[in-house]
Amino acid sequence: MISPRLVAKNDSEEPASRLAVLIDADNAQAAVIEPILAEIARYGEATVRRIYGDFTSVASASWKRVLQKNAIKPIQQFAYTTGKNATDSSLIIDAMDLLYSRKFDGFCLVTSDSDFTGLAMRLREEGLTVLGLKPLMRFVARVIDSY
């Protein structure tokens, strides 16, 4: 159930909610980011847009144009060891820093990774709405207030 504080806006209304959008590049494709941002815009203003991943890899070349066009700040996270997810840790640390800044009405977590369930629960405990968007290639993302 979506919180009554954060509901989709009509085109005639000004979005009032300030949202932090955090994207897990390890579990998203560049091709679906624009439809996801359009969906997020229905719920408020994405005042922070960050994406986390290792952008030095050849596989990440498709991100550059999308990030520039949509004013998304890349947060570089090297893979220091195999099997460890440094990207997840970096995203979670930033989310907690943003939470304690008290500048946001909600968070949008763009990932298909269930590792962020604990983060979503913690953000909700602070009274914030959490929108979980799964970045599938056919983008049938569900906007939810429970991650």
Stretch-by-stretch model annotation:
Residues 59-64, 135-143:
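Short, glycine/polar-rich helix-capping loops at beta-to-alpha or helix-loop-helix junctions
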Residues 28, 58, 114-115, 138:
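Short alpha-helical
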